[in-house]
Amino acid sequence: HQHSHAFDAFLAYEQPIIRKLGTDSAAYAYLLGYICHFVLDSECHTYIIPKSTEAGKNHLVMENEFDRFLLKKDGYNAISYPIWHMIPNDKATIHAIYEVYRPFALSKHKIKRALSGMRFYKKLLTCGCSLKRFVIRLLMKITFYYKQLEGHMMTLCAKSYAKHTNAVLLKHYKKSIFLANELILDFHKSVTQGKPLHKRFHTTLKSNEPLD
């Protein structure tokens, strides 16, 4: 699983692909977005993963509360925001992802299924104070999956601990913005000039600590 392996090992597969396709390709744009994902995850998970072992804390719920915080900060209704619109599943996007994952034999069919599935479930679990919310929560509870699935649907009210966790995550988020910019420029040099990858890439999506 990618979350458990050093990110530089993945990038080693990608360097020759981008050199072939070019830095103006859609695949490169997708890959740079994935680098942003890597930076944000590795920074925030360093805090979230150990924090989620505390009583009453949940990994997905903490991330969801931070999503709520950011959406409200930008003036959006976090409960009903159509988050699935941020997951395109058009042919161009599917082809770009296919090029990035070509070394891993991931078919376009599987990519389309994954993206379409994400869009479907994000839309299904986005609901305000409605009968739909009541029914979904009831099904989660009677099937004993509530704890596992709770974080996939934003609660109507923020958790009591969210003010504290959001403040910490905001610091990690701000740090990630500058770090992502630095690492993107570094990766670009590794592709275009053959320079070695930044040592920060020798971490996982779970932590910002080097593996060795």
Functional labels for PLM-detected ranges:
Residues 1-31, 35, 39-212:
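N-terminal leader/auxiliary helical segments
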